[in-house]
């Protein structure tokens, strides 16, 4: 058992959240560089000579320079073993991002210092609030002209409702960016440009009152001392207990592109972020140091290897230890399975996992039996809770250019819906197929993947659907009557759950008034 505890205590599992273009994929690259996982970091829209960013490994992502799927990367840093989950920054992929946030113990929030708190960041922070996830903040892009740092922190506090404790502080910005002052260590780290792709020694000056500071940065030294007087009086001190409750965020400044300040964030995550936490189930709380293995699936990714049409289920280990060849109990279908070929990840590069501990993410080969939200144990029957499905906000009817490929279309759509890329609805009264998504880009992705992976050419048509709700009723007779009277608005989703497809919000509200015994749910547990 003590061996298990040592491994659990080493783990730090976190995700990076941000508004699109705040620099999240770049920071992922630099974090991996510090973890020795990459020798030279790639940039997303690199020059011809630049490498493609490691975490954007799907063809469509490489073409567009955006992160669409969730990548998982593991690397050692500072005596810890860090699991980084890179989430899609593009606003159209919030469902996938949301589910990823159920698999981590802390988050790194990246903010563009020229723009401040943006809409997508606000939405993602609402999600982290549901589980009081601890948040570390990185104010990025100091190599550009930025807003006043105190204003930035005020905005985070007022808009995101979380106290800010500055750990590092910028000295100048844009062309005048000189470096950062580490408040807790009382040292200035000087900035040099052109070092973004590698790790090199930086010049460090110990002590804010060190005369060497004037020699290095001139009048900025006196400005820094004045600013620090103000900052110390106006901001919160770091409080570890408040951080762990999600009430306070340590704030770091830097530039991911210039690879400056990223090591400070990693130091903070290793020192302060929680080790793997207990997890709720429908029967009890599962502790990470329990002897028996448990885990849950938070994502399914199809076709990670275009050479083999495969699907991989991403599982967060919650307790015990995975060993190659072990027997697991797949709770939902009530079957035992031997797992000898689970995977670990380095963003698309996969290796066979010999062992895994709580906080680790492993991949299980999935031949159509595993769904998002599935629980695996060593025999105990319970279900981990808190992996939700959201009602889509946009709908299209999908049809084929070649009607003979209906079977392939349905297979492709069901697989993509199980993976969480899109939701599929089959109306009870017609042969239509309706696709639901959170944003327009998802529709494009689905058509692209149907063509490249299933050889199916599909096109969309508009459809008068405003929203969808999952419907439940404890009284079987009333549910049957509802089905009979409202069949023109009912459909089955990809998991055969009964769904109400509302043409307008007015229609939905009227139906909710007319059938008070029926529950119309906006979210559904997987």
Swiss-Prot record:
One molecular function GO term is: GTPase activity
Q: SUPFAM superfamilies given for it?
A: EF-G C-terminal domain-like, P-loop containing nucleoside triphosphate hydrolases, Translation proteins
Q: What keyword terms does UniProt attach to this protein? A: Cytoplasm, GTP-binding, Nucleotide-binding, Protein biosynthesis
**GO BP, one annotated term:** regulation of translational termination
- Give the highest taxon in the source lineage: Bacteria
**Location of this chain's protein in the cell:** Cytoplasm
Q: Which GO terms describe its cellular component?
A: cytosol
Question: Carries keyword ATP-binding?
Answer: no
Domain named tr-type G: residues:
9-277
User: Is this entry keyworded Cytoplasm?
Assistant: yes
Q: What is its main location?
A: cytoplasm
Family annotation (InterPro entries): EF-G-like_DII, EFG_III/V, G_TR_CS, P-loop_NTPase, PrfC, RF3_C, RF3_dom_3_sf, RF3_GTP-bd
An example Pfam family from this entry, by short name, is: RF3_C
Which positions bind GTP? 18-25, 86-90, 140-143
The cross-references to CDD domains, in alphabetical order and at most eight, read: RF3, RF3_II, RF3_III
What function does the entry list? Increases the formation of ribosomal termination complexes and stimulates activities of RF-1 and RF-2. It binds guanine nucleotides and has strong preference for UGA stop codons. It may interact directly with the ribosome. The stimulation of RF-1 and RF-2 is significantly reduced by GTP and GDP, but not by GMP.
What is stated as this protein's family in its record? Belongs to the TRAFAC class translation factor GTPase superfamily. Classic translation factor GTPase family. PrfC subfamily.
**PANTHER family per the record?**
PEPTIDE CHAIN RELEASE FACTOR RF3
The entry's protein name is Peptide chain release factor 3
Native source species: Shewanella baltica (strain OS155 / ATCC BAA-1091)
Q: Recite the lineage of the species.
A: Bacteria, Pseudomonadati, Pseudomonadota, Gammaproteobacteria, Alteromonadales
Task: Identify the coding gene.
Answer: prfC
């Amino acid at each position: 058992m003590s061996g298990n505890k040592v491994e659990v205590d080493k783990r730090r599992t976190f995700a990076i959240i941000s508004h699109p273009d705040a620099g999240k994929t770049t920071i992922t690259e630099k974090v991996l560089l510090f973890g020795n996982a990459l020798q030279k970091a790639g940039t997303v829209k690199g020059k011809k000579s630049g490498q493609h960013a490691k975490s954007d490994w799907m063809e469509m992502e490489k073409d567009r320079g955006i992160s669409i799927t969730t990548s998982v990367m593991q690397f050692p840093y500072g005596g810890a073993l860090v699991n980084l989950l890179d989430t899609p920054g593009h606003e159209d992929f919030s469902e996938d991002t949301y589910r990823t946030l159920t698999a981590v113990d802390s988050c790194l929030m990246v903010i563009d210092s020229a723009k401040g708190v943006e809409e997508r960041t606000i939405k993602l922070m609402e999600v982290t609030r549901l589980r009081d996830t601890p948040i570390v903040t990185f104010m990025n892009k100091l190599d550009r002209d930025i807003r006043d740092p105190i204003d930035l922190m005020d905005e985070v506090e007022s808009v995101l409702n979380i106290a800010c404790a500055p750990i590092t502080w910028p000295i100048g910005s844009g062309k005048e960016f000189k470096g950062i002052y580490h408040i807790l260590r009382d040292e200035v780290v000087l900035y040099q440009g052109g070092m973004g792709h590698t790790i090199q020694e930086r010049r460090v000056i110990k002590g804010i009152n060190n005369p060497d500071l004037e020699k290095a940065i001139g009048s900025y030294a006196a400005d820094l001392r004045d600013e620090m007087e103000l900052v110390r009086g106006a901001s919160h001190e770091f409080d570890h207990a408040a951080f762990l409750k999600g009430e306070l965020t340590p704030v770091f400044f830097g530039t991911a592109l210039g690879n400056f300040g990223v090591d400070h964030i990693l130091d903070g995550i290793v020192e302060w972020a929680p080790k793997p936490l207990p997890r709720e189930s429908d029967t009890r709380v599962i502790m990470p140091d329990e002897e028996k293995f448990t885990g849950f699936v938070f994502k399914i990714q199809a076709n990670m290897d275009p050479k083999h049409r495969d699907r991989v289920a991403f599982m967060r280990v919650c307790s015990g230890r995975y060993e190659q060849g072990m027997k697991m109990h797949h709770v939902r279908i009530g079957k035992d399975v031997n797992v000898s070929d689970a995977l670990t990840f380095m963003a698309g590069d996969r290796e066979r996992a010999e062992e895994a501990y709580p906080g680790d993410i492993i991949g299980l080969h999935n031949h159509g039996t595993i769904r998002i939200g599935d629980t695996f144990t060593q025999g105990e029957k319970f279900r981990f809770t808190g992996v939700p499905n959201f009602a889509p906000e946009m709908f299209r009817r999908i049809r084929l250019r070649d009607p003979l490929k209906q079977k392939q279309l349905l297979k492709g759509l069901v697989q993509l819906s199980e993976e969480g890329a899109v939701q599929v609805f089959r109306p009870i009264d017609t042969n239509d197929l309706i696709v639901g998504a959170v944003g327009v880009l998802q529709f494009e992705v689905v058509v692209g993947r149907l063509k490249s992976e299933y050889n199916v050419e599909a096109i969309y048509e508009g459809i008068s659907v405003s929203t969808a709700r999952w419907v439940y009723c404890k009284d079987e007779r009333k549910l049957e009557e509802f089905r009979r009277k409202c069949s023109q608005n009912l459909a089955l989703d990809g998991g055969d759950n009964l769904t109400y497809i509302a043409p307008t919000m007015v229609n939905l509200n009227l139906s909710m008034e007319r059938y008070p015994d029926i529950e119309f749910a906006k979210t559904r547990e997987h």
